């Protein structure tokens, strides 16, 4: 009888442990996936809209600058650098998901021409690997190798992101041609203000959803506020929930209007996009150009020599 009770107790403890482990996994997995800006991939087939706007701007509402640097021209089947700079004040702190302050992270999307893709590891030189650091790039879609995403990564370490890119070879890829191509890039620093499902993050300003008087402000145990607003005309009460993070701007007894800010705007980051152009250069065209320059130089040399020879003949005839 005692053995049976012991077995039941052990079975109960194992079942409880498994349940707790599953709950922790689900919660952790959700928080991690929601922390990445690239989870917007699930909602957009292409990160660049027909208007030219990159969809990251739908969640990162503030506008900030970025800078993209690529070579003017590259040869086929060549590895080159695309350098993205995301400047911001390193002293700034952002509001984290738990309402505390922390450093800013950065993320980026690089939209290359068809045929261009991330360089394989065996084609990357040691010098370039050192510039890249520990960054792990991935394709926006398995069938869109020309669109690369990265982030979030610590902004203090990676405010400059180096992408190793492999140019296509028209001899093996029929879709590639020796032309001038556009390159588009988007980069953000800091967390977004809106999640892909349309809900607000705690990194944005919260406005009143009704006109009336602030009847009560309840500070929640884990941070944030519940603000009770009573409409003076009909007595209707509305409760606005403020998550931890933004600073409260109103007080009890204050009259407010609909859409009036209840909090400050804690966002210190933002998103920016830019573009550049790159030429996929034909090696035969380069060789032809070099041959032309060499021909011009040789022609100039022969012309000078011929002129000197003619002057000598003239001088000789004058002496006679």
UniProtKB/Swiss-Prot annotation:
HAMAP family: Cytb6_f_cytF. GO terms for biological process: photosynthesis. Residues 1-35 form the signal peptide. One of its GO terms (cellular component) is chloroplast thylakoid membrane. The 4 large subunits of the cytochrome b6-f complex are cytochrome b6, subunit IV (17 kDa polypeptide, petD), cytochrome f and the Rieske protein, while the 4 small subunits are PetG, PetL, PetM and PetN. The complex functions as a dimer. It is found in: Plastid, Chloroplast thylakoid membrane. One of its GO terms (molecular function) is heme binding. It is a single-pass membrane protein. Gene3D superfamilies: 2.40.50.100, Cytochrome f large domain, Single helix bin. SUPFAM superfamilies: Cytochrome f subunit of the cytochrome b6f complex, transmembrane anchor, Cytochrome f, large domain, Rudiment single hybrid motif. Heme binds at residues 36, 56, 59-60. InterPro entries: Cyt-f_TM, Cyt_f, Cyt_f_lg_dom, Cyt_f_lg_dom_sf, Rudment_hybrid_motif. It holds the Pfam family Apocytochr_F_C. This is Cytochrome f. The chain crosses the membrane at residues 286-306. Component of the cytochrome b6-f complex, which mediates electron transfer between photosystem II (PSII) and photosystem I (PSI), cyclic electron flow around PSI, and state transitions. Binds 1 heme group covalently. Its cofactor is heme. Belongs to the cytochrome f family. Keywords: Chloroplast, Electron transport, Heme, Iron, Membrane, Metal-binding, Photosynthesis, Plastid, Signal, Thylakoid, Transmembrane, Transmembrane helix, Transport.
């Amino acid at each position: 009888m005692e053995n049976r009770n012991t077995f039941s107790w052990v079975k109960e403890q194992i079942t409880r442990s498994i349940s707790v482990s599953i709950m922790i996994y689900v919660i952790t997995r959700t928080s991690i996936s929601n922390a990445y800006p690239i989870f917007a991939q699930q909602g957009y087939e292409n990160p660049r809209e027909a208007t030219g706007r990159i969809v990251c701007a739908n969640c990162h509402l503030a506008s900030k600058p970025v800078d993209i640097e690529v070579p003017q021209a590259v040869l086929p089947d060549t590895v080159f650098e695309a350098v993205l700079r995301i400047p911001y004040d390193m002293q700034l702190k952002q509001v984290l998901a738990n309402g505390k302050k922390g450093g800013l992270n950065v993320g980026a999307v690089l939209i290359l021409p068809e045929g261009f893709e991330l360089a394989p590891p065996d084609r990357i030189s040691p010098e370039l690997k050192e510039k890249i650091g520990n960054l792990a790039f991935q394709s926006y879609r398995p069938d869109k190798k020309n669109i690369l995403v990265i982030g979030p990564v610590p902004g203090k370490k990676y405010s400059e992101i180096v992408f190793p890119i492999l140019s296509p070879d028209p001899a093996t890829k029929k879709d590639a041609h020796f032309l001038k191509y556009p390159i588009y890039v988007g980069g953000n620093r800091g967390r977004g203000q809106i999640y892909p499902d349309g809900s607000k993050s705690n990194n944005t300003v919260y406005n009143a959803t009704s006109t009336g008087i602030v009847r009560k402000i309840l500070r929640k145990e884990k941070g944030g506020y519940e603000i009770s607003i009573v409409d003076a005309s009909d007595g209707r009460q509305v409760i606005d929930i403020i998550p931890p993070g933004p600073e409260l701007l109103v007080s009890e007894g204050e009259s407010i209007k609909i859409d009036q800010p209840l909090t400050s705007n804690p966002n210190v980051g933002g998103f920016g996009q830019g573009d550049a152009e790159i030429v996929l250069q034909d090696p035969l065209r380069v060789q032809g150009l070099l041959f032309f320059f060499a021909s011009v130089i040789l022609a100039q040399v022969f012309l000078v020599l011929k002129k000197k020879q003619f002057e000598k003949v003239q001088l000789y005839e004058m002496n006679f």
